[in-house]
Amino acid sequence: FYAGSTVCAPSRCVLMTGMHTGHTEIRGNREIQPMGQWPLADETLTVAECFKRAGYETALIGKWGLGGPGSTGHPNRQGFDYFFGYLCQRHAHNYYPEFLFRNDQLVPLEGNIVNNERGDGAGYATGRALYSHDLCATEALQFIDQQNASKPFFLFLSLTIPHANNEGGSRGMEVPDLGDYADKDWPTAQRGHAAMIS
């Protein structure tokens, strides 16, 4: 596993552009209000754009964090034909979000309730009905199933497991089920982390 930086946005920028952080435009997790991070510029060449130019169908499912709604960094403006997931990194800390995005449309997730005072989707879920990673897995499988066998595709599946919900404190390892670790005599956060990675 390789990470181009110690934090999310610059590391993803390195992966998407092929440049090291000395040459990338995104070098930190700089937020842009009301939602999102500093966006990739229009002229930035991404791996998705390279695939698209070569005739591939392209999709990003999961976490983005390189441009919020309507920005030059939005995945649909950076070479991805299809996007489903989180635009904002802090929003992606929550595995039971009130909404995700499908392309540029907000998709409400009924039954998920988040203490979300800033309006950017970040916070800790108090109502948990739909687990985001199950939704992302379903979307990824559907994207693959819908592909034409005669046309290549590129799918960037960007899951955040086992990232803790930083806004959740000690409750931050949100999983639908602790599985084999439910009866372990460990702190809840450690049992949640073990369930995420196994």
Regions found by a protein language model. Name each.
Residues 1-198:
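Formylglycine-dependent sulfatase
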